[in-house]
Amino acid sequence: MREFDSETVRKIWQRVQSDLPVSQPAKETMGLPEWIAWELTFENLYRRIAGKMSGRTANTLRQFARQERQHAQLLRGICVMTGGTAPKIHPVPVQKASVSVLLRQCYGEKLRAISQYEKQCADNQFGEVFRNILQQEQAQCRFLLQLLGTIK
């Protein structure tokens, strides 16, 4: 377990002590609401694709949907820990399309997400969280590619 620096401790105490002013979200977290929406959209996308599949493939996609929900919860937690609040965010509606179109869409968006998470891994405070999310996103991409290889 790593030690917290004095700035982190100050922010935590500001959240605990109600008589102190609430700190403002750090600049690096300003994009988090969009990332949370992204993760919730992936959750819905995986559920939509799973509904069109069967067996182990559908189960794996439902597991990915649960991972995406967890990613959104982690990102909300980062918002709170950095002095903000847990934003209420709604995912982007998923289009109705064939499985192959949805898989291609999901894969392309996953590559963008991976690029964003790679940039955040150097973060001293939450880098480990971003690394864990990144590893899951990369595993999902590998599965999506395999699945795309089986679609006729």
Residue ranges and their predicted role:
Residues 1-152:
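Non-heme di-metal
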